[in-house]
Curated annotation (Swiss-Prot):
One of its GO terms (molecular function) is beta-fructofuranosidase activity. Belongs to the glycosyl hydrolase 32 family. It is found in: Secreted, Extracellular space, Apoplast; Secreted, Cell wall. Its main location: secreted. It comes from Arabidopsis thaliana (Mouse-ear cress). Keywords: Apoplast, Cell wall, Disulfide bond, Glycoprotein, Glycosidase, Hydrolase, Secreted, Signal. Pfam families: Glyco_hydro_32C (PF08244), Glyco_hydro_32N (PF00251). The lineage of its organism: Eukaryota, Viridiplantae, Streptophyta, Embryophyta, Tracheophyta. This is Beta-fructofuranosidase, insoluble isoenzyme CWINV2.
Length: 590
């Protein structure tokens, strides 16, 4: 094996060094802390979310095998029952009737047999006719080899699927055909091809620095055979974790499609979570069922410049098809961005973000994401603002709500675009660099304008979420940048030199593909104490930030709208709702 090129090695070093303790290149192991349990009485409420999914204590990461069975929603997730750092991982299991209120059950899968004795890692669920739901998951053997196993419910008549069995004929897929046994994990939901009678599923992997999604085929869901070629791969992308592969309708703008849909008017989505960057990328393309090949559309970037489900703190996502409502629903994990010491002291780490629906944008060139409508059942007191004109340097406070726990939806009208700054094409694939260069306090022509969240009254601490409009010189069309900037979010001083001792306060950014023909652009943010989920232009661009203010906490937090561009911007409409806690959120979880 030849050594990788110096440039690539240097890139890896940079990526790892800029990472935080959670959004890093690998799971960091803190053996002294991974079994340091916290009693329920000792769990710190500071920065703990109110309406997001999380257990009462300890560490969580990847959402696994979401599904609907006999009217009950199921979510499994990677969980450490003994501490607030990664380790001792089991498949925790929660159930819900409405995707809002959750009841914790006993862990469904945990290390117990030779084929998973050193780990039960991520996977997916598939509804198999005549067999019910089948979970495919990655097991870690005694010699640290990653293999693929299956588990089945003990009682199919139980809508809660409380008990799962791991049959002795596991594993079903082993890395014995040229695969990398140390990077071979996270099987997808399988899909069925009626024409040839085979099930198919993907497993993420890498070969040297090439990311790969291997395909496997089976008639009986037990004996799986590797396809002649991967469904897709890409050089210099490293390990592909948590792949997801599903169709979206080209014509139906309201409903999702089942994994096995093979009809007309559909495109396929291939999503991968890049272990190198800890971001998720997706492509839209065509899936040839005869050749088992997936080809991204020519206009869809493939690789590190690709489209993302979320441009912020968002990883290891997993979708499922809700056949009750005909929706494709997306779950995603947001780890903490504070320090390992903070996580250990507070006794918990990680949340699942609000589930989102997925549809194909009317352009056919990207997906759009939106919080599930069920979340609106938690809305309480509402305040509104209409036709509020903001000159350069002005900001207005949104009063009468609890800004640390709120759902705010605002539509801005930017009016005249003639004063928009000229767009520098050298930033065409570098929205983050542009956001860092032109932050919320850097005056522009049209923008920056947006929301100032989790702020003190004097802006000692604040997390701005904002737009800045540029003008493309060649086409004379607007180029819209969306940013969420955590750098000013907290006054906490970092004293350590190691990454685990420093709070991660990054900027996140993405471009928004919107024409602004009517001069309007919307921004919705779900704010929940230490998380800000923001949806630009009705979900064309989504950014999640984790933040930890020291003063803008609870009732001391403030919410503003602002404009720092020379061109006036009007708040055409703003609605903000206090958000209530669900009645149930995994009480009783171990």
């Amino acid at each position: 094996m030849s050594a990788p090129k110096f440039g690539y090695v240097l890139l890896l070093i940079v990526l790892i060094n800029i990472s935080n303790n959670g959004v890093d290149a690998f799971h960091k192991v803190f053996k002294k802390l991974q079994s340091k349990s916290t009693s329920l009485e000792s769990v710190s409420p500071l920065h703990r979310t109110a309406y997001h999914f999380q257990p009462p204590r300890h560490w969580i990461n990847d959402p696994n095998a979401p599904m609907l069975y006999k009217g009950v929603y199921h979510l499994f997730y990677q969980y450490n029952p003994k501490g607030a750092v990664w380790g001792n991982i089991v498949w925790a299991h929660s159930v819900s009737k409405d995707l809002i209120n959750w009841e914790a059950l006993e862990p469904a899968i945990y290390p117990s047999k030779w084929f998973d004795i050193n780990g039960t890692w991520s996977g997916s669920a598939t509804h198999v006719p005549g067999k019910g739901p089948v979970i495919l998951y990655t097991g870690i053997t005694e010699n640290q080899t990653q293999i693929q196993n299956y588990a089945i419910p003990q009682d199919l008549s139980d809508p809660y699927l409380k008990t799962w069995i791991k049959p002795d004929d596991n594993p079903i897929v082993k890395p014995d055909n040229g695969e990398n046994g140390s990077a071979f994990r996270d099987p997808t939901t399988a899909w069925f091809n009626k024409k040839d009678g085979y099930w198919r599923m993907l497993v993420g992997s890498k070969r040297k620095n090439r990311g790969i999604a291997y395909m496997y085929k089976s008639r009986d869901f037990k004996k799986w055979v590797k396809s002649k070629r991967p469904i897709h791969s890409r050089k210099k992308t490293g390990m592909w974790e948590c792949p997801d592969f599903f169709p979206v309708s080209v014509t139906d703008k309201k409903n999702g499609l089942d994994f096995s849909y093979d009809g007309p008017n559909a495109k396929h989505v291939l999503k991968v979570s890049l272990d190198l960057t800890r971001y998720e990328y997706y492509t839209l393309g065509t899936y040839d069922t005869k050749k088992d090949r997936y080809r991204p559309d020519g206009y869809t970037p493939d690789g590190w410049d690709g489209l993302r489900f979320d441009y912020g703190n968002y990883y290891a996502s997993k979708t499922f098809f809700d056949d009750k409502t005909n929706r494709r629903i997306l779950w995603g994990w947001a780890n903490e961005s504070d320090t390992v010491q903070d996580d250990t002291v507070k006794g918990w780490a990680g949340i699942q973000l609000i589930p989102r629906t997925i549809l194909l944008d009317s352009s056919g060139k990207q997906l759009v994401f939106w919080p599930i409508e069920e979340i609106e059942s938690l809305r309480g007191k509402n305040v509104q603002m209409t036709n509020q004109k903001m000159e350069m340097g002005q900001r207005f406070e949104v009063q009468g709500i609890t800004p640390a726990q709120v759902d705010v939806d605002v539509t801005f009208n930017v009016g005249n675009l003639e004063k928009a700054e000229k767009f520098d094409e050298s930033f065409a694939t570098k929205p983050l660099e542009l956001c860092n260069l032109k932050g919320s306090n850097v005056n522009g022509g049209v923008g920056p304008f947006g929301l100032i969240t989790l702020a003190t009254s004097d802006l000692e601490e604040y997390t701005p979420v904002f737009f800045r409009v540029f003008k493309d010189a060649a086409s004379n069309k607007p180029k819209v940048l969306m940013c969420s900037d955590a750098k000013p979010s907290s006054l906490k001083k970092d004293t350590g030199t190691d990454a685990k001792e420093r709070m991660y306060k990054p900027s996140f950014a993405g471009f928004v593909d919107v024409g602004l023909l009517d001069g309007k652009i919307s921004l919705r943010s779900l704010i929940d104490h230490s998380v800000v989920e923001s949806f630009g232009a009705k979900g064309k661009t989504v950014i999640t930030s984790r933040v930890y203010p020291t003063k803008a906490v609870g009732e001391k937090a403030h919410l503003f709208v602002f404009n720092n561009g020379s061109q006036p911007v009007t708040v055409e409409s703003l609605n903000a709702w206090n958000m209530q806690k669900p009645l149930k959120m995994n009480q009783g979880a171990k």
